[in-house]
């Protein structure tokens, strides 16, 4: 915790100051642009104002939301004297790519343990970039095997005199995402203010529980009326809401914030996750095509395509009012396009 406890609501300056007390390594090209998408809105038949927060442009190995997260994660690793970063994530992970790049920038070794089967052919997408960056890549059939491999590798590295840091081994891995995206929310609020606009009526983000905790933290801390809508790349069975609340509470404790009992307006969409993680669906493909052809903005088939499909679905169901201001936080992940060329071919026209 940092200093005396502050009770919500707090000011933007107070929240920014609390975040600024935490160790952090500057990495992201921030502030990222906030772009209005009027042609996209017209294509959806709405007069709502839709903005995209371009966190696909954070820099570092094709950018994405993990660059902001890594500002806090890397600071913690360096504070622990790490010379080797170990990360256990999924085989398509954007986090793996960005972590490997950041490790190179700081002279650290990067070891990835990925859940999934090693490709029989040449690597593609994020995995190709992981290899280009020189990350040491291991594969595991499931999460228990992944954890066992991480523990074994960390032990071997320590025995060899190295200083391993298993990034996914503590709650701070998720809390760092909340801190990063509370800060990003402050950034986009400032950009909206420059346009003469207040807090958005709704904010959409791809998340299964970690990233969305940041906007939730900011909304609760500042007392914003914003609906925070997360869209998962997989069906979480409803677990994302509880996971986000837990991460939000942990991050608030680090900041010394008492958020009280007022819940943020968190809505979660699991229905765009099927047929599963790493797989796409017609709604995501439609979203990719519609945003590309109306605004020239690219989405991926696994994360951001599904998130924008959730936004499109809400507009069509009347959940977005005609006078509302909506922000979609673009979390990147564009290398995944090249894992799904066969899925994309039928919609190219």
Enumerate the language-model features and the residues they cover.
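PLP-dependent amino-acid enzyme catalytic core
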Residues: 1-349
